[in-house]
Swiss-Prot record:
A Gene Ontology cellular-component term: extracellular region
Species assigned in the record: Lucilia cuprina
Keyword line: Amidation, Neuropeptide, Secreted
Residues with Phenylalanine amide modification: F11
Recorded superkingdom: Eukaryota
Swiss-Prot/TrEMBL GO biological process terms: neuropeptide signaling pathway
Protein name: FMRFamide-3
Tissue specificity statement from the Swiss-Prot or TrEMBL entry: Detected in the thoracic perisympathetic organs in larvae, and the dorsal ganglionic sheath in adults (at protein level).
Record's subcellular location: Secreted
Keyword Secreted: yes
Length: 11
């Protein structure tokens, strides 16, 4: 995961 923001968007 590049950035946490994107990670949260995934879920």
């Amino acid at each position: 995961s590049a950035n946490t923001k994107n990670d949260f968007m995934r879920f």
